[in-house]
Amino acid sequence: MLPGAARSPCLRFPRRFAHGGLAAPRTALWATAWYGIHSKAFTSANSPLRKDASKEPALASNSKTTNPIPTQASASVNPPKDARNATTAKKDLLSETTLANKEQRKADWAIIKEMAKYLWPKDDWGTKLRVGTALSLLVGAKILNVEVPFYFKSIVDSMNIDFATVGGTAYTVAGSMIIAYGVTRIGATLFQELRNAVFASVAQKAIRRVARNVFEHLLRLDLNFHLSRQTGGLTRAIDRGTKGISFLLTSMVFHVVPTALEISLVCGILTYQYGFQFAAITAATMVAYTAFTITTTAWRTKFRKQANAADNRGATVAVDSLINYEAVKYFNNEQYQVARYDKALKAYEDASIKVTTSLAFLNSGQNMIFSSALAAMMYLAANGVANGNLTVGDLVMVNQLVFQLSVPLNFLGSVYRELRQSLLDMETLFNLQKVNVNIKEKPDAKPLQLHKGGEIRFENVTFGYHPDRPILKNASFTIPAGQKFAIVGPSGCGKSTILRLLFRFYDVQEGRILIDDQDVRDVSLESLRKAIGVVPQDTPLFNDTIAHNIRYGRIDATDEEVHKAAQRARIDALIQKLPEGYQTAVGERGMMISGGEKQRLAISRLILKDPELLFFDEATSALDTYTEQALLQNINSILKEKKRTSVFVAHRLRTIYDSDQILVLKDGRVAEMGSHRELLDLNGIYAELWNAQEMSLAQDLEFERETERDDVESKERDMAPGPKAQQ
């Protein structure tokens, strides 16, 4: 049995309990002590979590959290209008809302204009040269394509003789035309393939730049945005959007303009060679074909949007289920998750069927229009041959020219359909780039200078995730430089919010936060966040090796520095025992290692970063008592050695009783502040909480002593000799 001084005062309460595969901190004792001290119960008025989020599935409603983070239901639906940090009202990027035709066209043109910047960048002459070369090759290919029917006409007319009477061979009669015909077709194909090869790097470079810009923008967005988004659906939408970039660029350069050029050439040739009737039929066909295609495709757009939205929902359910695999298993909800996924698949199936059937209608209408035009032109040409005005070669040439149009026309129809699809897929991608970055640094922001050693001062700070539910209310306190500072209080009182405000995940609504007399809003974000190190309550780990996760604290750290950081966090010995050592994979979100190991990896990462300001948010809640005490001793030695300003957020008072200053929060206000001894002498909230935890510890010790006595007595009875048998 461990000595009483080393034991946790919370042993009677569960250290952690399973929730979604994560280890939750022990907050039950705080709630018990707090309710026992005060007659009126604490409500969750300060908590940003909505109580009425009952429209979510039952599994979600069973889970509770004490972390004051706005949920999607609250943060994105009712954001504060007057808070600089709050997310402004915005439409759901993954929704299936169908815009009016005028609005949709406006959105499409905005995307096309944006992509034109990547197609013809101002300062990239290499890209401009490639685009210009590709366009030249394209024009050459189209001209050669239009020349092919002329050679075919000449071949037919040349061969329309009586060889028995005239004599000669096919080579002597039409040899040059046949060679020209073959060379022209080969040249057109060669130009097209060269065009594709030249333009390939332009499209791929644009995809990379757009994807990089979107990803960079996502990382700049505030915490509230990421907490309210559906990761699975968002990643699926981004993936579709990036795939649509290549098609959009190719369509802009190689399909829309070239098809218009080819149609103009054919109409001009028909008018010049055969009269206005042929050109009129061609022009009318183009107008009818284009109008029918655009109208029908616009009608089909809503079906594609519904399919995309269902696809996003399915991806969201799948990703959430796999990430929270343990929660699904703990509550035997496999069939529930399968039913949710199948519901999204059914919606996608229904929308896809509508897409396919409407596509059949579109294709049928296009073929009817074109076939009618072809029949009309063939009649005119045949009538001209019958009247002696045209030759058989002219009939063949008209047929060839019309069929020459069929390829770009049919292709234009499919291109327009795919173009609309690409624009829809890219709409989410470009809407992401329009989401405002709420936390910005000033143009004249300067690097943070810690000339006083890292003194932190909150001056009349008021903040709430929602206007009607403030978390901090006119809070003022100072964290002296180089001291160990602790923040305690009930769940939802704003302890973790203090860290988020200091780190500038959010900005205060009133008051200001100073570090060495510098407002955090006046310094650069990079220097501010570089100076702060955090061990969060829920340790974020990447699906990579242990070494990578520790080195994430300082990317350029050597292996030796990584090992030293792990030693100081008392996890090196454990890592060395693993078969693959530091190259052991931790799994998705670190699920392959225990909660205590995750927290020690987080502390290793913090030690490696070596920042001036340290924050520990229940950093040892998942550790056993012995490891916790040993690790705290190491942390305290580091703090004393380097004289770092450190802040500990804790529920178990025995882990922070040696702090230089302890701040007690109540209802978002500073209730008490002082050293452990001063707060006990004050005989206020802190003293009552301490006594409640000590009483719990005493009860634990008495219970264990009674258990041990019972065990000893039981063993003695078992070993005592029984009554002698009668002789």
UniProtKB/Swiss-Prot annotation:
Its main location: mitochondrion. Residues 131-421 form the ABC transmembrane type-1 domain. Gene3D superfamilies: ABC transporter type 1, transmembrane domain (1.20.1560.10), P-loop containing nucleotide triphosphate hydrolases (3.40.50.300). Keywords: ATP-binding, Membrane, Mitochondrion, Mitochondrion inner membrane, Nucleotide-binding, Transit peptide, Translocase, Transmembrane, Transmembrane helix, Transport. The keyword Transmembrane helix applies. Residues 456-692 form the ABC transporter domain. Glutathione binds at R300, T301, K302, F303, R304, N363, S364, G365, Q366, G413. CDD domains: ABC_6TM_ATM1_ABCB7, ABCC_ATM1_transporter. The keyword Lyase does not apply. Residues 200-248, 295-360, 417-727 are mitochondrial matrix. Belongs to the ABC transporter superfamily. ABCB family. Heavy Metal importer (TC 3.A.1.210) subfamily. This is Iron-sulfur clusters transporter atm1, mitochondrial. It comes from Aspergillus fumigatus (strain ATCC MYA-4609 / CBS 101355 / FGSC A1100 / Af293) (Neosartorya fumigata).
